[in-house]
């Protein structure tokens, strides 16, 4: 089979797939050329490329398989009409959620200790400053309590923090929750603003579903405890850009660490980055362990496709019947 990755430069990803699928051709295309590539591919791996209705006009395409979780850029309705399955890889257990959770905690520490200023002080020979804020005895609010949110909570267990989880439907609803992971409180979406009022650190881990676009907007930021930090390792659209910029400029938000943005690549000259923002280039899941684990899961689903077996983690399972 021919498998096309809709991005260039992901050598580790390509190598992982080729090692797992030695009989298959692994190709690359520019994101804008996804429809053209689909005409000559059995499987597309979109990464961050928009997969529009035009892609599903292909007579050869048999599967759109994401190398990770995010499906927000894929026209799943068009895929369903064309009878083409769309699948992803759950974050937990693949190395993805685990890697993302580690970066989220690193970003909290960078914000609390004002790492950019600390580095600047070093080169200016100013030692003993700035005075930072510890994670210990802080309140961390995790907005979105799926696989990634749970892995963040799991890793915070030894830090002496109070953890409040917020999910759309609250405890006992939605995706399976690991009972071995401790949180001090778990509330549904109605409790979001009350939770934000307690937060020293807000970690956004919610998917960019239609219901979540702009979830952290002016009202949510107005509800936040003054001087709180915010981390986004989910998707840019979950936070309202204008509201975040206003919150940073007013000082209500003490700082933000962003691994995801509203457009990617993001403009390094954007006014937002002149505020107290630590940006990273969407690397939360970019680790050797994640590439290897997700690659194995992707390859396993492609082998199921080849064998005519039931695909796993299909977003439109009705096409499989």
Language model region names:
Residues 88-100, 117, 180, 263-321:
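C-terminal helix-to-coil terminal segments
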Residues 118-151, 181, 185:
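Glycine-rich NAD(P)-binding loop of Rossmann-like domains
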Residues 1-41, 306:
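N-terminal glycine-/charge-rich "phosphate-binding" loop or analogous flexible N-terminal tail
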């Amino acid at each position: 089979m021919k498998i096309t990755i809709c991005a260039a430069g992901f050598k580790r990803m390509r190598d992982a797939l080729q090692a797992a699928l030695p009989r298959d051709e692994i190709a690359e295309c520019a994101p804008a050329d996804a429809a053209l590539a689909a005409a000559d591919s059995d499987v597309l791996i979109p990464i961050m490329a928009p997969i529009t209705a035009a892609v599903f006009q292909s007579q050869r395409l048999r599967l759109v398989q994401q190398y990770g979780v995010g499906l927000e850029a894929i026209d799943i309705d068009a895929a369903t009409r064309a009878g083409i399955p769309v699948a992803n890889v759950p974050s937990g257990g693949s190395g993805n959620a685990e890697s993302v959770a580690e970066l989220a905690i690193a970003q909290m520490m960078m914000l609390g200790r004002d790492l950019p200023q600390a580095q600047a002080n070093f080169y200016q020979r100013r030692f003993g400053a700035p005075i930072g804020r510890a994670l210990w005895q802080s309140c961390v609010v995790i907005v979105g309590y799926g696989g990634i949110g749970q892995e963040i909570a799991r890793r915070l267990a030894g830090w002496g923090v109070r953890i409040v989880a917020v999910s759309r439907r609250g405890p006992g609803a939605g995706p399976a929750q690991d009972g071995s992971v401790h949180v001090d409180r778990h509330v549904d979406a109605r409790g979001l603003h009350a939770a934000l009022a307690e937060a020293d650190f807000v970690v956004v881990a919610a998917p960019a579903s239609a219901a979540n676009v702009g979830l952290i907007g002016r009202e949510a930021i107005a509800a936040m405890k003054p001087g709180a930090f915010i981390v986004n390792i989910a998707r840019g659209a979950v936070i309202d850009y204008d509201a975040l910029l206003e919150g940073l400029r007013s000082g209500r938000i003490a700082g933000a660490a962003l691994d995801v943005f509203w457009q990617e690549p993001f403009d390094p000259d954007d006014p937002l980055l002149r505020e107290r923002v630590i940006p990273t280039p969407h690397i939360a899941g970019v680790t050797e362990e994640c590439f290897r684990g997700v690659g194995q899961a992707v390859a396993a689903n492609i082998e199921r496709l080849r064998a005519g077996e039931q695909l796993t983690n299909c977003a439109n399972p009705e096409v499989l019947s």
